[in-house]
Curated annotation (Swiss-Prot):
Homodimer. Its cofactor is Zn(2+). One of its GO terms (molecular function) is 3'-tRNA processing endoribonuclease activity. Its EC number is 3.1.26.11. It comes from Lactococcus lactis subsp. cremoris (strain SK11). This is Ribonuclease Z. It catalyses: Endonucleolytic cleavage of RNA, removing extra 3' nucleotides from tRNA precursor, generating 3' termini of tRNAs. A 3'-hydroxy group is left at the tRNA terminus and a 5'-phosphoryl group is left at the trailer molecule. Zn(2+) 2 binds at residues 67-68, 213, 271. Belongs to the RNase Z family.
C-alpha cells in the first residue's frame, strides 16, 4: 500500500497547498485506489500523478465542509470521460447529505455518468465495509459539524509457500501446490504434505487511519490504535491551542499526542493553515517530532509506501 496527498491545505486553496484529498493506493493488494475526501481541483491534482480515475473504486468523505467535497461533482463527471468502455461502479461513503449534494450537482449541470454510484450514508460509528482482505471502521470526531474518521484494516495474509522444500520432499510442481497454499493436507506418492510444514508465518496486515477535521479526542486514539500510519490534521502550531479548539481543529502537538497515545508507527500531518510557509513548516515538524519522532508534515503530491 502507498499513500499520496493530492491536497494538504486548510479551508481554501493556496499557492502551495490544494484543498483536502488523499489517495490510498492498493494496487498490489486489490488493483484499486481509495480516495479520502475530494476538495476543489482534486481531479486537476490527479493529472500530476500516475493515478487513473477508473482505478478509484471507493471514496470516503469525512464531512461536508466545502474544502473536502467541492471537487466531487467534477471528478465524478470526468471519471466517465476518462474511463474505458467497461466502467466500474463506485462506492461513496460519507455523512448524511452527501447523496443529495452529489445528485443535485449532477442534475443541475445535466451530467450523465456511465457508471453507478452506490451511496453509503453514515450516521453512527461501526464497521462499514468488509471483504476477504480488508475491513473499514468509522467513528465520530469532534469538529464543528458531523465529521468522521476512518480506520482501514488489512487482514492477515497467508505466508509464503516454500516451493523448494516441497520439490525436495518429492511433490512435483502443479495444482497440488495450490491446495497446500489453501491450507489443505495433500497425499501424494505415499507421502503426506501438511501445509504447516511448508507455509511461513502469516503476513500481518497493515492498519491505516485517516481522520477528518477534529479537536483532540479519545475517538481519534481509538481509531488510530496501533496503526502503521495515522493521517491527522494539524491546522495550527502548538501555541494556538485555544484557536484550534474554537474552530474545531488540532495543533501539531495535539496530533502528535494522539499518535503517541495510540502507539502509532508513522504520523503524517495534513490540513495545514496557509499561514505556515517556508521555514514555518519546519517549526511544525519540530513541534510534532518532539512528541512523536516518526512524524512528517505532508505536502501536495507527497507519496510514501506504508510500513
Amino acid at each position: 500500500m502507498e499513500i499520496q496527498f493530492l491536497g494538504t491545505g486548510a479551508g481554501q486553496p493556496s499557492k502551495s497547498r490544494n484543498t483536502q484529498a488523499i489517495a490510498l493506493k492498493m494496487l498490489d493488494e486489490r488493483n484499486e485506489i481509495w480516495l479520502f475526501d475530494c476538495g476543489e481541483a482534486s481531479q486537476h491534482q490527479i493529472l500530476n500523478t500516475a493515478i487513473k480515475p477508473r482505478k478509484i473504486t471507493k471514496i470516503f468523505i469525512t464531512h461536508l465542509h466545502g474544502d473536502h467535497i467541492f471537487g466531487l461533482p467534477g471528478f465524478l463527471s470526468s471519471r466517465s470521460f476518462q474511463s474505458s468502455d467497461e466502467q466500474t461502479d463506485l462506492d461513496l461513503y460519507g455523512p448524511v447529505g452527501i447523496k443529495e449534494f452529489v445528485l443535485t450537482g449532477l442534475r443541475i449541470s445535466g451530467s450523465r455518468l456511465g457508471y453507478r454510484i452506490n451511496f453509503h450514508e453514515i450516521d453512527s460509528a461501526g464497521k462499514i465495509f468488509e471483504d476477504d482482505s480488508f475491513e473499514v471502521y468509522t467513528d465520530l470526531l469532534d469538529h464543528t459539524i458531523f465529521c468522521l474518521g476512518y480506520r482501514v484494516v488489512e487482514k492477515n495474509r497467508v505466508g509464503e509457500l516454500d516451493a523448494n522444500a516441497l520439490k525436495e520432499a518429492g511433490l512435483p510442481f502443479g495444482p497440488l501446490f495450490g491446495k497446500i497454499k489453501k491450507g489443505e493436507v495433500v497425499a501424494y506418492d505415499g507421502k503426506t504434505f501438511d501445509p504447516k510444514d511448508y507455509i511461513g508465518a502469516d503476513k500481518v496486515g497493515k492498519i491505516v487511519t485517516i481522520l477528518g477535521d477534529t479537536r483532540k479526542t479519545k475517538t481519534a486514539v481509538r481509531l488510530a490504535w496501533q496503526a502503521d500510519l495515522l493521517v491527522h490534521e494539524a491546522t495550527y502550531e502548538a501555541s494556538e491551542s485555544k484557536m484550534a479548539r474554537a474552530h474545531g481543529h488540532s495543533t501539531t502537538k495535539q496530533a502528535a499526542d494522539v499518535a503517541k497515545e495510540a502507539g502509532v508507527n508513522r504520523l503524517l500531518l495534513t490540513h495545514i493553515s496557509a499561514r505556515y510557509v517556508g521555514p514555518l513548516v519546519g517549526q511544525l515538524v519540530r513541534e510534532a517530532q518532539a512528541v512523536h519522532a516518526n512524524t512528517f508534515v505532508s505536502k501536495d503530491l507527497y507519496e510514501e509506501k506504508i510500513g
